[in-house]
């Protein structure tokens, strides 16, 4: 059976330095490797993320990023001090990176996927 492993998600940007600095300086992403103005490989919350400039006709990437931070208020205060508009929406605080990508922060992870085994167990328990 094939078992792929994701080693990076690449984000294309027209504002490489600004986006790089936002993720590193504001969201505390760890720089794994970097070639200035060409790419930066980051680790953000355990997720590998590569930022590259749009050089060969690539479109600016868009996505929603979900982060869980146990004590998120300090991060939200830092974002506000840096001029980032933060909106609260139930358990999430929402803000955007400099190119408009939506980032949602909660204090705990949402359950996005349950394994087939846990679903079978849940169904049997309900019966």
Predicted regions mapped to residue ranges:
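Conserved short beta-strand elements that form part of the metal-binding/catalytic scaffold
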Residues: 30-62, 102-109
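Amphipathic alpha-helical segments
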Residues: 15-30, 78-79
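A structural signal for short, hydrophobic beta-strand segments that form beta-sheets
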Residues: 6, 31-32, 85
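N-terminal beta-strand motif that seeds the catalytic metal site of vicinal oxygen chelate
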Residues: 1-20, 48, 63-65, 111, ...
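Vicinal oxygen chelate
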Residues: 2, 5-14, 43, 55-127, ...
């Amino acid at each position: 059976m094939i078992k792929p492993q994701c080693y990076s998600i690449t984000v294309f940007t027209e504002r490489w330095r600004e986006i790089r600095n936002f993720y590193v300086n504001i969201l505390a992403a760890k720089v794994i490797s970097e070639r200035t103005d060409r790419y930066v490989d980051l680790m953000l919350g355990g997720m590998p993320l590569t930022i590259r400039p749009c050089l060969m006709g690539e479109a600016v990437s868009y996505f929603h990023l979900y982060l869980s931070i146990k004590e998120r208020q300090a991060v939200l205060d830092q974002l506000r001090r840096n001029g980032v508009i933060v909106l609260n929406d139930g358990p999430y605080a929402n803000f955007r990176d400099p190119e408009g990508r939506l980032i949602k922060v909660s204090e705990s992870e949402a359950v996005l996927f349950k394994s087939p085994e846990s679903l079978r167990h849940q169904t049997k328990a309900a019966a």
